Design a protein with these regions (language model features):
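His/Asp/Glu-rich metal-coordinating catalytic cores
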Residues: 3-7, 12-188
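Long, charge-dense
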Residues: 190-198
Length: 198
């Protein structure tokens, strides 16, 4: 998917000389340039020295693969299956199957309990690379959302305001939808344009 923790090295790969293909889903391919520009601008504004130039950033190309794709061009003997991971628009899990070497399932970031984006069932793989960012958390998403709603309602009742710094796609849109659905109609909700557009 297009989040910086998965795509920010693409301009650096170009700076190192990589000119091969980069494949992604069509939504991810469309979102990557904007995410990269925003991330690079943010990094520079905070004094970071990036290991690539403007031209490397401008020349990043991502080739979209339609959701039913099974054969990746230029990789004979490899079958790729992917399905929606529910994390954000364009995010997928991927299963790679080699004729002679077995199969590998890579989950990427997953959100099995999302309200807006569905996740497809995971297939079996002989080897597994599993995203575990929240592995230490035992609180189910529904319980997290209920707690957030309680805190937001309590704050609003006390004439306070709630600010949620969330990513513009994926969880941010999911939280906005949840709060709009659950909070009383007279409670104003303000959101960054990108969250609303998601």
């Amino acid at each position: 998917h297009a989040h910086e923790d998965h795509t920010a090295a693409l301009p650096y790969l170009r700076a190192l000389g990589y000119r091969g293909p980069v494949y992604a889903t069509a939504p991810t391919a469309a979102l990557v340039p904007g995410f990269l520009r925003k991330w690079a601008s943010y990094s520079r504004n905070h004094g970071d020295r990036l290991p690539f130039g403007e031209q490397d950033l401008a020349e990043v190309r991502v080739t979209p693969l339609p959701l039913g794709t099974r054969q990746v061009p230029g990789l004979p003997g490899l079958t790729v299956t992917f399905g929606r991971s529910g994390h954000m628009l364009g995010s997928v899990w991927m299963r790679f199957a080699w004729e002679r070497a077995g199969s590998l399932l890579y989950t990427g970031d997953m959100a099995l309990e999302g309200r807006l984006l569905a996740a497809d069932p995971l297939p079996k793989g002989e080897f597994l690379i599993l995203e575990c960012a929240y592995a230490g958390s035992r609180l189910a998403q529904d319980a997290q959302y209920r707690r957030l709603l309680e805190l937001a309602a309590e704050t609003v009742a006390g004439k306070g305001r709630v600010l949620l710094p969330v990513p513009p796609r994926g969880r941010g849109a999911d939280l906005l939808f949840f709060l709009a659905e659950k909070l009383p109609q007279d409670v104003p909700l303000w959101a960054e344009g990108e969250v609303v557009d998601a």
